[in-house]
Amino acid sequence: MKKTIPVVGMACSACSAHVEKRLSEMEGVHSASVSLTGRSATVEYDETIVSLSQMKQAVNDIGFDLVIESNRSIAEIERRNYTLLLRKTLLSWCFSILVMMLSMGWGTWLFGDVLQSSNSSVLQSYNSSVLQLSLLLALANILFCGRDFYVNAFKQLRHGVASMDVLVAMSTMVAFLFSTFNTFWGDAVWTPRGIEWHTYFDASCMIITFVLTGRLLEEKAKNATAGSIRELMGLQSKTARLVNEELRMKNEESAAASPSSENEESAAASPSSENDSSFFILHSSFQEVPLTTITIGDVLEVRAGERVPVDGVVVEATSFMTVDSAYVDEAMISGEPTPVRKSKGDKVLSGTVLQQGTLHVRARQVGEQSALANIIRMVQEAQSSKAPVQRIVDKIAMVFVPVVLCLSLLTLVAWIIIGSTFNVLPHAILSAIAVLVIACPCAMGLATPTALMVSIGKAAKNNILVKDATALERLKDIQAMVIDKTGTLTIPNQQIDFTRADSLPLEEREQLKPHAREAITTLISMGVDVYMMSGDRDDAARYWAEQAGIRHYHSMVKPQDKENLVRQLQQEGKVVAMVGDGINDTQALALADVSIAMGRGTDVAMDVAQVTLMSDDLRRLPESIRLSRRTVSMIRQNLFWAFIYNLVSIPLAAGIPYAFGIHWQITPMWASALMACSSVSVVLNSLRLKFISL
């Protein structure tokens, strides 16, 4: 069984890497892929060996949570968590501002005249009270606002793993404990040795405040990256209008039993002189019920302006224009703006909108089996999938935190050994804390998945369904594209008499799809060699190749020939994409580096394909390649700046400038602010993909 499960509590790539490792190591789990930006885990497992509750317990042990309860709304959980995070952030700012005011001597400024006229014991008592009040405020900040950092860090260290929570917990706790020691024993321990001591409650508070602020902004930005999924989910109906089938059948029987030769008077009294479908619609009773209660075979009523709640078959249809049909907007599936006429026996899909008329629809696929649910699942799985570069980053993130801990310890020891002033210990501790805080695996971890999530969502809005991140990344390298002719490049003419089709001109038998030539021209200008495969005779194949602007074509081909061409091009060192729509294309689709299916093709072709074009507009082909190139470029930008940030900031926090005579370094407080900004900037940079023109 394969299932996508929401994960709560992940903050950095180390978090997602540890959750993935934990799930992958469980007996019965075949594969697990955890998405930080998607906040979900896609798990393939044997339900006879391992259960969801066992997975939940394993993940809970390291400080995270799997949401497996069907009665828990993911959107509601995310809303509640965001509200809680917002409250913690605001409260932490209050604590931090108060501590900063005390540490900056605002009390001395307010009561300066009184303190100056007081004796030394009063002044000492005042200073001691200020420090103790700062201690209490910092402790309250830790307990109420930073509690999750410490709880998660304890759980993770107990199981031998470490994430951003460990860095934050250790840095703030060291600053707090060192300051607490100085508050009560500073004069007794340091003053006799000639060491000037300080407290750093302000640093302890501000680290938590800045990290919480960064996460709040990050959550806001990540929610924006998931906008496409929310839009798709918004197409799902929550309720449906269930028709009383027993009454409807009685109406049908009554209408069928009425003799066609009834007098005019009785005909006038009836809703229609004929067995008008509107008769059944107007006289069928119904009730509004939750969509989850609908089962296959139920008949539902859909009115103008409403979304079709399930996949089904039209039982009855009527509109003010016609007595036996209605018009449905299928733009969310096909991308075509023109409403489609639906009559009795026609299929309708969930999420589509009835533009005019009334429909009675018999449910065929409901809930998770509907076309819309499948599209949502495909997009979620694609956004949760990982590009090859992300797997490398995850491996780095797994060791990043332990390496930072070692660097922090090395900084502490180095300053103690080479320091030449009496204040070397406080300075060494502050430098070590700054290294812990400023190192940010989050920026590296978010670099790839945020860009992928935005681009896959943008692709879905443009009727391009990408099944996995690897395909999206590989599209940029396409050098050759093999396109099947019939159904992909051309549309058969449904109006002709096929018994005499051979005697008709080629352009009457079928027609080139709109914008096909424009799409081919664009592909060629992008450096892609296009090959057309056709089962037609050579003259027909040449004709359609010329119409489409394709230089390379093959005629009278069999399914094996398509596969052979793909293999031949690959042997020449080219990255090959195959575009098809039928069962006879599946061998070539499976072999190609990137497989692309038309959304109106066979289910087999779409199952094999990595990318599905939901509309017949072939301009989506160059658009998908262009999107891939922009996405990979964005990922490289994000990774470059994330690595540069860590390479530059860690030495500055450790105090390297002192070695060159520059008496300046990044303090723990500013380190936390820079760390928060680095993560947010990566997410905001990825969001630029939403606004690019394809």
Predicted features, each with a name:
Residues 17, 466, 476, 489, ...:
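Conserved ATP-binding TGD loop and adjacent catalytic N/P-domain core of P-type ATPases
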Residues 27-45, 49, 53, 198-201, ...:
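Conserved cytosolic catalytic loops of P-type ATPases
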Residues 75-94, 152-175, 376-408, 432, ...:
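Soluble-to-membrane junctions at the N-terminal ends of transmembrane alpha-helices
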Residues 84-239, 395, 666-668, 694:
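Transmembrane helix-loop-helix hairpins at the membrane interface
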Residues 109-115, 119, 177, 458, ...:
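Membrane-embedded alpha-helical bundles of multi-pass transporters
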Residues 430, 440-501, 505, 588, ...:
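Conserved catalytic phosphorylation-site environment of P-type ATPases
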